[in-house]
């Protein structure tokens, strides 16, 4: 049996506040997650020999560090299944961009192999396997827009208004660990409630506490923010960056902004198509109401 073109959607952090730090060094966060239709796709073919094979390459990522492989082996160990899988991956979500691509791929692997192998784990059981893989992995298994607290394990579903987004990736890679270890990072933001978040339009609520550190350390990102502002777009960073996003009421408005930005860059002689040396990605995307695989798991 084979599962083809299984989606792994990107996420946006609509806001991200750092409200504390645990004794073990993990930061306590408050954030709101929303999935968008920018997605990786994975393929899973069952193997009877129990092996987990990787039919793709990720530049700079060893197989032992690959979250997809780790997720597959974690499910294997937890269930005791003797089945294996050959896994393919087509990347569209930028790596290291703050859009949760690796985490989403891992979650889709847990969900898809749970279905392919017939291991029958519930959503809560899959979420328990997800958390050790990374703080963002559980929300993709949770499968809904969520208000998150703690280190990623405390999730509450929230209903968000329809929206679209323009996602821009500056020409920079931002290591998450570097940002969280910066001495100037705000770590004592006042806590907010779900009611606080829902009382305002999502584009107006809060901030990303990681953004000032990234803007100070990475001139490619701060330059992108300034350039976009000069061209009429107020953007916010997702996660630890470097991807930026602007919210729009409808997809046609986001597409128009994409076209205007890319046209401006073409006139300046800096681009063909949708990218140029300063922006690796300029993409209009629709905000999703839920994960496309949400119904693949028994609650």
Swiss-Prot record:
Gene3D superfamilies (UniProt xref): 3.30.230.10, GHMP kinase, C-terminal domain (3.30.70.890)
Entry keyword annotation includes Kinase: yes
Annotated catalysed reactions: 4-CDP-2-C-methyl-D-erythritol + ATP = 4-CDP-2-C-methyl-D-erythritol 2-phosphate + ADP + H(+)
Catalytic residues, chain numbering: 11, 136
Domain of life: Bacteria
GO biological-process terms attached to the record: isopentenyl diphosphate biosynthetic process, methylerythritol 4-phosphate pathway; terpenoid biosynthetic process
SUPFAM superfamilies reported in the protein's UniProt record: GHMP Kinase, C-terminal domain, Ribosomal protein S5 domain 2-like
Sorted UniProt keywords: ATP-binding, Isoprene biosynthesis, Kinase, Nucleotide-binding, Transferase
Enzyme Commission code: 2.7.1.148
InterPro entries found in the cross-reference section: GHMP_kinase_C_dom (IPR013750), GHMP_kinase_C_sf (IPR036554), GHMP_kinase_N_dom (IPR006204), IspE (IPR004424), Ribosomal_Su5_D2-typ_SF (IPR020568), Ribsml_uS5_D2-typ_fold_subgr (IPR014721)
Annotated residues for binding of ATP: 94-104
Record-level Gene Ontology MF annotations: 4-(cytidine 5'-diphospho)-2-C-methyl-D-erythritol kinase activity; ATP binding
Family of the protein in this entry: Belongs to the GHMP kinase family. IspE subfamily.
Function, as annotated: Catalyzes the phosphorylation of the position 2 hydroxy group of 4-diphosphocytidyl-2C-methyl-D-erythritol.
NCBIfam families: ispE
HAMAP family xrefs: IspE (MF_00061)
PANTHER family hit by this protein: 4-DIPHOSPHOCYTIDYL-2-C-METHYL-D-ERYTHRITOL KINASE, CHLOROPLASTIC (PTHR43527:SF2)
UniProt name for this protein: 4-diphosphocytidyl-2-C-methyl-D-erythritol kinase
